[in-house]
């Protein structure tokens, strides 16, 4: 399958493309160097201080990558991954069926990994995005991150834009642009009808405003706990809440 190039930066230095097996380790490296150390919930639970916890989240991310809708930003000069959007397709559950995040939190062994996934699950459950979007499937930008030395170049914003374009291509063009990291042919369905994300810091929330996303709910960090302590205890005073946001395509 031809690798889909979704966009190129104005200075032609960065390509935005589907995640493939060749770049999986580089994409995971972005999480280790940036996301686990800087993202608010990751900081609160202390995941970067626990190698086994990072391994557990890495394993989960590898599984998510097999859904074929994750994206990377690639430095064309160095051929290195400098940004990533690990995206997950979330299908509407029926009855009392447990969410994917809930099931994962049950099998995580390391407390930081368990608490990070429980945060994601609890935040998602504070509002019914499927009802708000009148959708049976959502594309969730699960982990969005850029290497620190590539900051202030609009990479995370472009990854969000391209995630929306990918979802629109699946829904309206019926073009199967899913890219399996194992090289397998993936089914076109499920097809997302909206894109959503948890924006956990002021910088990521500015992306939501810039791209005209809708805030579904705002949640104070004092309602999320790790090792018996609220997230708010471990985060700076200028970041006291997270938002659940969406964009209907």
Where are each of the predicted segments found?
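Glycine-rich acyl-CoA binding loop
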Residues: 152-160
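Structural signal for hydrophobic/aromatic residues that build the beta-strand cores
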Residues: 27, 71-73, 87, 141-144, ...
């Amino acid at each position: 399958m031809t690798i889909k190039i979704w966009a190129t930066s104005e200075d032609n230095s960065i390509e935005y493309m589907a995640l493939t097996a060749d770049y999986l380790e580089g994409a995971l490296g972005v999480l280790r160097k940036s996301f686990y150390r800087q993202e608010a919930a990751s900081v609160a639970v202390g995941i970067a201080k626990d190698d086994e916890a990072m391994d557990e989240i890495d394993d989960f991310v590898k599984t998510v990558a097999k859904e074929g809708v994750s994206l990377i930003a690639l430095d064309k000069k160095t051929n290195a991954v400098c940004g990533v959007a690990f995206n997950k397709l979330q299908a509407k559950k029926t009855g009392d069926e447990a969410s994917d995040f809930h099931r994962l939190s049950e099998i995580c062994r390391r407390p930081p990994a368990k608490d990070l996934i429980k945060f994601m699950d609890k935040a998602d459950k504070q509002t019914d995005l499927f009802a708000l979007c009148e959708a049976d499937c959502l594309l969730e930008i699960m982990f969005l991150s850029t290497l620190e030395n590539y900051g202030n170049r609009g990479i995370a914003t472009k990854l969000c834009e391209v995630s929306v374009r990918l979802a629109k291509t699946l829904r309206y063009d019926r073009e199967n642009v899913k890219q399996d990291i194992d090289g397998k042919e993936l089914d076109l369905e499920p097809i997302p009808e909206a894109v959503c994300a948890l924006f956990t810091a002021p910088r990521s929330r500015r992306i939501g405003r810039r791209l005209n996303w809708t805030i579904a709910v705002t949640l104070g960090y004092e309602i999320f706990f790790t090792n018996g302590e609220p997230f708010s205890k471990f985060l700076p005073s200028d970041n006291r809440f997270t938002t659940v946001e969406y964009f209907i395509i």
